[in-house]
């Protein structure tokens, strides 16, 4: 699986405030998968994230594409390191509740790990 499909939404830099919070979905729980197409671990994790998105409609599932030639991708990579200074590589995950970043690390890349991550 190289591309995630709806209901997963691809984010752009314009979807974030200057402080790194989400502009939209302020009343929702959101999980953001930070991924890259060249990343083997991402390729393994994407089907779990896709299934999580399909099975958990109350959660907004978003993704940040961390590779490619689009100028916005470069902005997104810079934004990732601002939002999550501990970012070390792909894949990684962010949790937002009511539009605000929740400082929390995920323990794994499975659908079960994602369920635990949001609770």
Where do the model's predicted regions map?
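N-terminal leader/targeting and pre-domain segments
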Residues: 1-30, 64, 86, 92, ...
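Short pre-active-site segment immediately N-terminal to redox-active cysteine/selenocysteine motifs
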Residues: 35-38, 89
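Thiol-based oxidoreductase modules, predominantly thioredoxin-like and allied folds used
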Residues: 34, 57-77
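The canonical Cys-X-X-Cys-His
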Residues: 39-42, 93
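A short glycine-leucine-enriched loop at secondary-structure breakpoints
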Residues: 79-88
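Typically the conserved alpha-helix immediately C-terminal to a functionally engaged Cys/Sec
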Residues: 41-57
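Short glycine/proline-enriched coil/turn segments at helix->beta-strand junctions
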Residues: 27-28, 56-58
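Eukaryotic short linear interaction motifs
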Residues: 40-41, 69-73, 102-103, 112-113
């Amino acid at each position: 699986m190289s591309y995630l499909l709806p209901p997963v939404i691809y984010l752009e830099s314009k979807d974030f405030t200057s402080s790194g919070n989400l502009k939209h979905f302020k009343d929702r729980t959101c999980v953001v998968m930070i991924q890259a197409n060249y990343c083997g671990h991402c390729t393994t994790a994407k089907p779990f994230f896709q299934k999580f998105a399909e099975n958990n409609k109350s959660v907004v599932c978003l993704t940040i594409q961390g590779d490619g030639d689009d100028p916005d991708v470069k902005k997104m990579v810079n934004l990732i390191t601002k939002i999550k200074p501990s970012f070390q590589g792909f894949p990684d995950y962010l949790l937002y509740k009511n539009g605000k970043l929740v400082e929390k690390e995920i323990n794994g890349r499975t659908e079960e790990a994602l369920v635990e991550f949001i609770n």
